[in-house]
Amino acid sequence: VGLESPPKLAVILSQVKFLSRFYIDGFILGIIIAGVLGSVFPVSGTAESILNWATKIAIGFLFLLYGARLSPQEAWKGVKHWRLHTVVLAATFVLFPLIGLALRFLSPTLISDELYTGILYMCLVPSTVQSSIAFTSIAKGNVAGAIVSASFSNLIGVFVTPLLVVLLMNTTGQATVDFSSILDIVVQLLIPFIVGQLIRPLVIGWLQKYAEPIKYVDRGSILLVVFAAFSESMKEGIWSTITIWQIVILTIVCCLILALVLGVTTLAGRKLGFDLPDQIVIIFCGSKKSLATGLPMAAVLFAGQPVGLIVLPLMIFHQIQLIVCAAMAQRFANRDPVSVS
């Protein structure tokens, strides 16, 4: 999930088989538990100050790891197949944002301003790496193309997503990203990411050797961000403003967004003359949104705002995309080669 080096194919396949059987993402369960704990046991005073600093350090370390893991050579290797990657990037950073802007009418009539901000933010984050590659593999698509597209999306997403937030959310009045926020983006996100890229040749062997324990440090940092966000939301009384009806509407909206993007990417792949393996890349890489990148980035971009509510649409969308895409991947895998056009 998120900014990470492409996993080995055997690991990918085992994870997809698990997903396709149970349709439950263990990472999502951990995030839900962290959110519940933050809501039930909100911190304050000295503990809150310590938590805030720990969260900032965790986010910086997280993006340092992201930079060290992501191979720029891998991302640039597929430039020769630029048409494929252009379509995927257009789906991620053009189609999704346009859909998010078009849904402005939902607020405040059907959902709160904070939830709409979350929907728009969800539409601005980059694609995933691991699940995009995993589903492409199980669907018998162009795995090499998926690796390049997903990696490139994450590589530029670290820079493009904050830029889109500044441009789109400030102009629509959905969030305030001032100079202080931009400075936080540079200090907590961009500098650690660039440092990670620079030290990658020195540490990549160590990261690969200890990939399994580092994964838990990686995810633990994200869980800390979620706990802090929900703790702050509970302390500010934000959750009392949300109704079950709004959650239902939010879930329906996330389903409709995914359905629309899947429809457009499917049609685009066919109409633009891509073969089926490349169409699969466009469908799975172009429809994903990264939880691992989006959550910590939101904590920086929306500091002082109800982050717990803002990331809620991304959390819901992430689980929906896993369920739907796992089913689609199995359907592609079981297709009749003779009947495929």
How should these model regions be labeled?
Residues 264-297, 339:
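C-terminal hydrophobic structural anchor segments
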Residues 237-244, 297-315:
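Extracellular/periplasmic helix-loop-helix junctions in multi-pass membrane proteins
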Residues 104-159, 169-181:
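Membrane-interface helix-loop-helix junctions at boundaries between adjacent transmembrane segments
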Residues 91-99, 124-129, 145-166, 186-189, ...:
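Membrane-embedded alpha-helical segments of transport systems
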Residues 3-107, 166, 170-274, 336, ...:
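Structural signature of multi-pass alpha-helical membrane transport proteins
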Residues 82-89, 110-124, 141-151, 248-249, ...:
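The feature identifies polytopic integral membrane transport proteins across all domains of life
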Residues 77, 130-142, 267-271, 297-303, ...:
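Helix-loop junctions at the membrane interface of multi-pass solute transporters
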Residues 261-269, 297, 311-337:
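Membrane-helix cytosolic exit motif
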